[in-house]
Amino acid sequence: MIHCGICGKAKTADVQFICCHCINGSPAVLLRDKMNLLILRQEVEQLKTAVEDQLETGFAGEGQLGRQLQKLDIYNEKRRLIKLRQRLQLARNKVQLKRNKYNELLQIMSTNGYLEESTSATDSIDLEEQAAEESASLDTLSHILARNQKQLFAELCRWFRIRKSDEDDVFSYTIWGLPMVNLKNGSELDPSIMVSSMRYLQQYLQLAFRIWLFKAICDKPIENDRNIIENFTQLIYDTLDILRARKLVSKSVSIRDILIRYDLDGMIYHLSQNKYLSSLDDASNSYPPTMQNIKQLVMSMIPSI
């Protein structure tokens, strides 16, 4: 049998017990319990503040949660673009079928003179109207696709935090807060930072290709700093490929001149800003931007390797 520790009143529960009358009539007991309650509330508020800070940091994009959510948004948007592209292709096929049918009917009407002119004219007008409607629908889908691509690519650039740095004279651009590697000064970076920077660039280019060109590029992961030449070669080749597809460089661009003027980091930054890169042209196409030619340039521009 449990009794009150002050008045001795019986209590059957197997817990430490003080009756309500004694709590209210004993200042020492009441003060102790109130102090415990205040301490408990303070601890709860501290835990609540810590949880809110963690959630705010995570959803703001600085923590792991924010990164995963942003990555999920990009992949969801990419799926929407793929579906939109499929709808666009179906609309194009439908328009082409209408045009083929229209041409076939025109040929039949021209070879069979017994068809009445009124019927031929009516059929021709109907087919032209259908073709015009399908073309308008195709144009609408094309505009929607282009707009969504621009929005998704802008979000991609914000996610990777590609920025120009005015404080560093050696590395003018950053990605995810790290110096963006370049041919001129890449050897000055710590090997681990260089590899991390290259990995971010590779991930950025992979997603950019899927947004603009709906195709994947070389997904061989960059694991260490032993194949620096191959890593630089692949990154430069992919960057030039998407720059040419986006018409941000001349079709006959001189790869030597553009690397001297902008280097890899400058090319990536101009791509993120959708800015045209002016350079000399290789009109004779004597040095096309192939993997082998780019590799030779990389080897000549990094004398320390």
UniProtKB/Swiss-Prot annotation:
Belongs to the ATG14 family. It comes from Kluyveromyces marxianus (strain DMKU3-1042 / BCC 29191 / NBRC 104275) (Yeast). Coiled-Coils at the N-terminal half are essential for autophagy. It holds the Pfam family ATG14. Kluyveromyces marxianus proteins are shorter in length and have a more ordered secondary structure than their S.cerevisiae counterparts, which might contribute to the superior thermotolerance and solubility. K.marxianus could be therefore useful as a new model organism for further elucidation of the molecular details of autophagy. It is found in: Preautophagosomal structure membrane; Vacuole membrane. Disruption phenotype: Still forms preautophagosomal structures (PAS) in proximity to the vacuolar membrane. It is a peripheral membrane protein. GO terms for cellular component: phagophore assembly site membrane; protein-containing complex; vacuolar membrane. It comes from the Eukaryota. Residues 34-147 form a coiled coil. This is Autophagy-related protein 14. GO terms for biological process: macroautophagy; protein transport. Component of the autophagy-specific VPS34 PI3-kinase complex I. Required for cytoplasm to vacuole transport (Cvt) and autophagy as a part of the autophagy-specific VPS34 PI3-kinase complex I. This complex is essential to recruit the ATG8-phosphatidylinositol conjugate and the ATG12-ATG5 conjugate to the pre-autophagosomal structure. ATG14 mediates the specific binding of the VPS34 PI3-kinase complex I to the preautophagosomal structure (PAS). Keywords: Autophagy, Coiled coil, Membrane, Protein transport, Transport, Vacuole.
